[in-house]
Amino acid sequence: MKFGIEFVPNEPIEKIVKLVKLAEDVGFEYAWITDHYNNKNVYETLALIAEGTETIKLGPGVTNPYVRSPAITASAIATLDELSNGRATLGIGPGDKATFDALGIEWVKPVSTIRDAIAMMRTLLAGEKTESGAQLMGVKAVQEKIPIYMGAQGPMMLKTAGEISDGALINASNPKDFEAAVPLIKEGAESAGKSLSDIDVAAYTCCSIDEDSAAAANAAKIVVAFIAAGSPPPVFERHGLPADTGAKFGELLGKGDFGGAIGAVDDALMEAFSVVGTPDEFIPKIEALGEMGVTQYVAGSPIGPDKEKSIKLLGEVIASF
């Protein structure tokens, strides 16, 4: 099992750099930085992380081909690869329709858009010209092939991830979700003459770890509420939860009733949408994900009640694998 960690760049960048360095020191192999217009710029953040670290692989987790053109992303990730001496990884997904609506961006043909974007970026990163004549001139990646991970959720995206990417970043925390997702990734990989073992299947989890299990759970409840609000009915059905659960949380959060939303998060929702607990409780949960085909565990928001302490505790977990 490989281990990654996600940070949202909404804190001072100096703090994020220190936390990523700590993660590197305790054994994390990947750092994923979210890319959203209302936070700090992902590539400027990554550049400073590259300067402050030595071995950890790093990249956006995830960008999209609507807000940033594939050519701009290719240039940015090649520059990051140069700055980090060959440690760049690229996470790209279809994005969030609600965000695009707020920005006045039309969200059309996500599967074909992702497919075309990855093809263009691979061409540019190889130093070649695209059919329309675009070519990177003043920047060249250190790696011969920068790994490209696809953020994927739905069946078509999961199959496409298996077909054209090096890894799949899946927003899920429960083995049941990977029991459904991994066969689709495998199908896509085999359609392209690859095998499932060629794909790094990453569980992008809602993670909260602490020496106090209850404190860990409490820190994750607001994140679980937002995950529930954004999940479609089939996900709830998979976990034996009422199909209208998402609508209920959407209503609570929509009117700003965060306390009500937190209070409505029960044990079944926590089990479905998070990995929480003490280090001893974490180990079997990560092992269960591995049994379903997960090859990278990503510790996502909130990480824990105290990020620095929680990263050190995750280091204890990593040492068990």
UniProtKB/Swiss-Prot annotation:
Q: Which GO terms describe its molecular function?
A: coenzyme F420-dependent N5,N10-methenyltetrahydromethanopterin reductase activity; oxidoreductase activity, acting on paired donors, with incorporation or reduction of molecular oxygen
What is known about its induction? Answer: Increase in abundance from the earliest stages of exponential growth, reaching a maximum level at the mid-exponential growth phase.
Where it sits in the cell: the answer is:
Cytoplasm
pH-activity note: Optimum pH is 7.
Provide one Gene Ontology biological process annotation: one-carbon metabolic process
Q: By its UniProt entry, which Gene3D superfamilies does this protein fall under? A: Luciferase-like domain
Q: Name one Pfam family in it.
A: Bac_luciferase
GO terms under cellular component: cytoplasm
Q: Quick one: which pathway?
A: One-carbon metabolism; methanogenesis from CO(2); methyl-coenzyme M from 5,10-methylene-5,6,7,8-tetrahydromethanopterin: step 1/2
**Catalytic activity annotated for this protein?**
5-methyl-5,6,7,8-tetrahydromethanopterin + oxidized coenzyme F420-(gamma-L-Glu)(n) + H(+) = 5,10-methylenetetrahydromethanopterin + reduced coenzyme F420-(gamma-L-Glu)(n)
Please name the SUPFAM superfamilies in this protein's record.
Answer: Bacterial luciferase-like
Q: What class of enzyme is it?
A: oxidoreductase
**Per the UniProt record, which EC number(s) apply here?**
1.5.98.2
How is temperature linked to this protein's activity? Optimum temperature is 40 degrees Celsius.
Q: Which NCBIfam families match?
A: F420_mer (TIGR03555), PRK02271.1 (NF002619)
The task this protein performs is described as:
Catalyzes the reversible reduction of methylene-H(4)MPT to methyl-H(4)MPT.
What protein family does this chain belong to?
Answer: Belongs to the mer family.
What additional remark is attached to this entry? Answer: Oxygen-stable.
Q: Which protein is depicted? A: 5,10-methylenetetrahydromethanopterin reductase
Q: Which gene encodes it?
A: mer
